[in-house]
Structure formats: structure tokens, C-alpha cells
């Protein structure tokens, strides 16, 4: 079984082909990703119109490259999977229209995948883990703690009430004059910084509900930066290290709370899974590895190339859905907003 996956929800254009092995695990046969960082760097963030146009220019070539790399033709495919949202509507439409056209011409099943669900299922592609598991989904636009009970069965235990973790990293980087994208730049600067120089707040620590709030932390860093301006390179490094340490402390505390809540709604987890672009942060991975070990669980995080947006995760999510007969109609809509997990009932936990 081979599925083509198409990803165009933000600033990566991607096409991949994933197959199912005999043991049920996924095999990435091709994974083509073209980043638009250079196109957006001058603006300090993603410009939706530029992103959509860039997808149009390269998507067909990436699909052709994926097929060429595998030696497959369209007749060899069992399905066409595409990220139908959430994301920037212009980009989502580019991928969705392309996928619908291919599905019509080749008469292959269309699999309209939720981009967030694809992140949630990536650990099954790379490690073959079973359900249920606790997912920390942390990216530029989303921060959620989710009980993943099965394909299509997702219960949100906690979320951010303001900024997503990746968004906070990007805003701090911009405030400190670092390059775009901000997350890797903050992590790089933090390597030579003193994480104890600035006593930044740890919002929501100890709260029963495992939600996040990062706007206050971001404001506190801005006030410290203004207080000591003009900033030296060491000041920037120390601010980044202090900010990253605060984020890690908050995440560990919130995940610990989610682990407590998990048992009441989904039983014993098979693993703690970290997914999304922020899961590439080394300090966060180390802290989560320690936390998972204390809980007697493995930490499962995708290889770094699969933390960010990619076509392989879309293809795999499509393949998981295809095996369950969850095929979409050709009229499937583009969905710029598309929650993928139900909220935890107030009576649970």
C-alpha cells in the first residue's frame, strides 16, 4: 500500500510517498520538502500571499520528484492524501486542489487529512507505538496536550489560552533582533547564555488543569530587555537562555499534570510523544526524556526532519485512515480552522 502525501498549509511545500510494511509500520519511500524561509525572512514572518504563490510554483515538481525517487507511477498509488487544514487558506487550497485533481484523474481515493492529526500520528510512523499515548503538540500556531486513543479519537487535556510555544519563541527572537525563524535562533543563542541571570515567571505552574499561558512570560522578557538596553550579545544570550529555561519548566510541569489526568480518561499511556516544530528543541527533549523516565514511559519524538511540516506525516495519516476505510468525498472543503481533538469534559480528571 502506497500513499502520496501533500503538505502546503504554511511555509513548507512538501510531497512524500509512504508505504505500509507487512508488520503495519510505515516506510518513508520519498520525502521531498522545500522551505520558504528565504522568501519570508525579510518580513520577519510568513506572508500568506507569498506562501501560496511559492506553493504553486514548486508543488508539481516535488510530486514528480517523489514519484521518480520511488520508481512509482500514479497507477501504483493506493491513495492521495493532502493536508486540508488548518493553515493559511491560500496554501491549503493549492494543495487541496492539486490533490483533488490527481484523485479525479487517477481515480484514487482522496484522503483529506487534518494537519494536526498528522503530527499526532507521526510517532506511529517512526516508532510503531500503540494506542493510547500522551501527545505534546507544540508548534508555531498550536500548543496542546492530547490523549491519543486511536485514529480519529483525540481528547484534549490542555491547551494554551494565549500564545503557542513556537509563537512565543518567534516573538522573543524578533524582539531581540534575531533572524527568522526564531525558535532555532533562540536555542542557538541560549547555548552560550546564563539561564539564571533573569528571574522570569513560570506561568500556570502547579495548576490542576494542564493549560498554558505564555503572554506574561513574553512580556516579562520584554521588560527586562528594555531595562538593560542597549543589549550586548551576552545580554541576548542570557535572555534567550532564561526564556528557554522558563519554557522548559512550564512544559514539564504542564505535561506532568496531563499525565495525572490521562489515567482517568484513557488508561495507562504507552508513551509520551512530542511532536511539532518545537519538539526539535534540544533542551526540551532532554527535559521530557527525564520526565518520561520518571513516569516509566519512553519519550517518542520524531527525527528532526519530521518535527516540522512535511509530506510524510500527511501520507502516513492518510494511510492510517485509508486502512480504516475513512475516505473523503471530492467535495471535501479547505478548512483554515480545524480542531482535531475534543475538549476534556469538565467532570473528567
Swiss-Prot record:
Its main location: cytoplasm. It comes from the Bacteria. Keywords: Acyltransferase, Cytoplasm, Iron, Metal-binding, Transferase, tRNA processing. Pfam families: TsaD. Its EC number is 2.3.1.234. GO terms for biological process: tRNA threonylcarbamoyladenosine modification. Disulfide bonds: none annotated. It catalyses: L-threonylcarbamoyladenylate + adenosine(37) in tRNA = N(6)-L-threonylcarbamoyladenosine(37) in tRNA + AMP + H(+). Binds 1 Fe(2+) ion per subunit. GO terms for cellular component: cytoplasm. This is tRNA N6-adenosine threonylcarbamoyltransferase. It comes from Methylobacterium nodulans (strain LMG 21967 / CNCM I-2342 / ORS 2060). InterPro entries: ATPase_NBD, Gcp-like_dom, KAE1/TsaD, TsaD. Fe cation binds at residues 115, 119, 309. Substrate binds at residues 137-141, 170, 183, 281. Required for the formation of a threonylcarbamoyl group on adenosine at position 37 (t(6)A37) in tRNAs that read codons beginning with adenine. Is involved in the transfer of the threonylcarbamoyl moiety of threonylcarbamoyl-AMP (TC-AMP) to the N6 group of A37, together with TsaE and TsaB. TsaD likely plays a direct catalytic role in this reaction. Belongs to the KAE1 / TsaD family. GO terms for molecular function: iron ion binding; N(6)-L-threonylcarbamoyladenine synthase activity. Gene3D superfamilies: 3.30.420.40. It is found in: Cytoplasm. Its cofactor is Fe(2+). NCBIfam families: gcp_kae1, T6A_TsaD_YgjD.
Amino acid at each position: 500500500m502506497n500513499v502520496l502525501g501533500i503538505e502546503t498549509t504554511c511555509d513548507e511545500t512538501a510531497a512524500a510517498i509512504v508505504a505500509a510494511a507487512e508488520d503495519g509500520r510505515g516506510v518513508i519511500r520519498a520525502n521531498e520538502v522545500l522551505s520558504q524561509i528565504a522568501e519570508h525572512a525579510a518580513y520577519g514572518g510568513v506572508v500568506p500571499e507569498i506562501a501560496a504563490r511559492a506553493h504553486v510554483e514548486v508543488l508539481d515538481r516535488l510530486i514528480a520528484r517523489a514519484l521518480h525517487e520511488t520508481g512509482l507511477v500514479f497507477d501504483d498509488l493506493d491513495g492521495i492524501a493532502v493536508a486540508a487544514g488548518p493553515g493559511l487558506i491560500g496554501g491549503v487550497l493549492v494543495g487541496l486542489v492539486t490533490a483533488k485533481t490527481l484523485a479525479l484523474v487517477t481515480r484514487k481515493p482522496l484522503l483529506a487529512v487534518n494537519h494536526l492529526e498528522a503530527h499526532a500520528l507521526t510517532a506511529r510512523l517512526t516508532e510503531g507505538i500503540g494506542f493510547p499515548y500522551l501527545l505534546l503538540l507544540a508548534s508555531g500556531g498550536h500548543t496542546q496536550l492530547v490523549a491519543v486513543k486511536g485514529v480519529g479519537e483525540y481528547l484534549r487535556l490542555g491547551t494554551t489560552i494565549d500564545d503557542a510555544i513556537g509563537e512565543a519563541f518567534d516573538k522573543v527572537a524578533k524582539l531581540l533582533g534575531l533572524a527568522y525563524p526564531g525558535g532555532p535562533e533562540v536555542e542557538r543563542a541560549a547555548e552560550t547564555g546564563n539561564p539564571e541571570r533573569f528571574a522570569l515567571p513560570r506561568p500556570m505552574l502547579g495548576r490542576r488543569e494542564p493549560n498554558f499561558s505564555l503572554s506574561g512570560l513574553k512580556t516579562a522578557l520584554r521588560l527586562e530587555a528594555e531595562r538593560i538596553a542597549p543589549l550586548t550579545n551576552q545580554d541576548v544570550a542570557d535572555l534567550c537562555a532564561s526564556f528557554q529555561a522558563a519554557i522548559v519548566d512550564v512544559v514539564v510541569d504542564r505535561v506532568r499534570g496531563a499525565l495525572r489526568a490521562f489515567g482517568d480518561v484513557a488508561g495507562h499511556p504507552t508513551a509520551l510523544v512530542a511532536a511539532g516544530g518545537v519538539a526539535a528543541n534540544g533542551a526540551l527533549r532532554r527535559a521530557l526524556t527525564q520526565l518520561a523516565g520518571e513516569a516509566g514511559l519512553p519519550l517518542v519524538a520524531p527525527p528532526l526532519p519530521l518535527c516540522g511540516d512535511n509530506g510524510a506525516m500527511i501520507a502516513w495519516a492518510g494511510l492510517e485512515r485509508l486502512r480504516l476505510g475513512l475516505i473523503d468525498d471530492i467535495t471535501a472543503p479547505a478548512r483554515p480552522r480545524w480542531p482535531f481533538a475534543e475538549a476534556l469534559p469538565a467532570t473528567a480528571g
